[in-house]
Amino acid sequence: MANQKKKEMVHNFQQKFTDKMKSLGLHFKNIDLYQQAFSHSSFINDFNMNRLEHNERLEFLGDAVLELTVSRYLFDRHPHLPEGNLTKMRATIVCEPSLVIFANKIKLNELILLGKGEEKTGGRTRPSLISDAFEAFVGALYLDQGLDSVWTFAEKVIFPYVEDDELVGVVDFKTQFQEYVHSQNKGDVTYQLIKEEGPAHHRLFTSEVILENKAVAEGKGKTKKESEQKAAEQAYKLMKNKKSL
């Protein structure tokens, strides 16, 4: 009975996975490798499989491959940023909250093989489980198809959303805007808090970003830091839209 259930789950996974790869425009050779990438330890335990057949080793590899891929992207995209800033930006992209966003864009959690108990307790929507599966998939893709395929995947699933509104708080817009200013030799950037309002337990802060003694944009947030990020985001987007600052 258990073996039949396992066969059904694996067959269902293979069909869904094949369809998913087609939709992403990606090729694969070793489907067993990807099955391992999506096998949570609870699935392995339920069917008394070898404990090394779960996805944790591939997750370990995928984390390193993601760091390399994102490092190259940031290195090429931000030629004026020093190492410290690049490291900070990479850390905010290759982290659980952002990986969950990327995974959810393509509904990767639908592929995860879970044990009965883990499924019942909501494991399929658990952020840590989703981000782990995302990293494991990248590790499997690297082993099966190489770094070029990982880059192709990242171009479709990661890079387009790095500066998306949904990732505000993940992307450091203050750093992005500072880089633009540096590349244009436009002088120093400063931030000024111009308003605080609301009760103590629900404050709203408004900050403006100042470039060459001129306020160029403002933003609001629940903290001073968030309001500065919002102001920098507005200034950065004005720059991207080629409007004068």
UniProtKB/Swiss-Prot annotation:
SMART domains: DSRM (SM00358), RIBOc (SM00535). GO terms for molecular function: double-stranded RNA binding; metal ion binding; ribonuclease III activity; rRNA binding. This is Ribonuclease 3. It comes from Staphylococcus epidermidis (strain ATCC 12228 / FDA PCI 1200). InterPro entries: dsRBD_dom, RNase_III, RNase_III_dom, RNase_III_sf. Homodimer. Its main location: cytoplasm. It is found in: Cytoplasm. One of its GO terms (cellular component) is cytoplasm. Residues 17-146 form the RNase III domain. Residues 172-241 form the DRBM domain. Its EC number is 3.1.26.3. Keywords: Cytoplasm, Endonuclease, Hydrolase, Magnesium, Metal-binding, mRNA processing, Nuclease, RNA-binding, rRNA processing, rRNA-binding, tRNA processing. Transmembrane segments: none annotated. SUPFAM superfamilies: dsRNA-binding domain-like, RNase III domain-like. PROSITE patterns: DS_RBD (PS50137), RNASE_3_1 (PS00517), RNASE_3_2 (PS50142). Mg(2+) binds at E59, D132, E135. One of its GO terms (biological process) is rRNA processing. It catalyses: Endonucleolytic cleavage to 5'-phosphomonoester. The active site is at D63, E135. The keyword Acetylation does not apply. Belongs to the ribonuclease III family. It comes from the Bacteria. It holds the Pfam family dsrm.
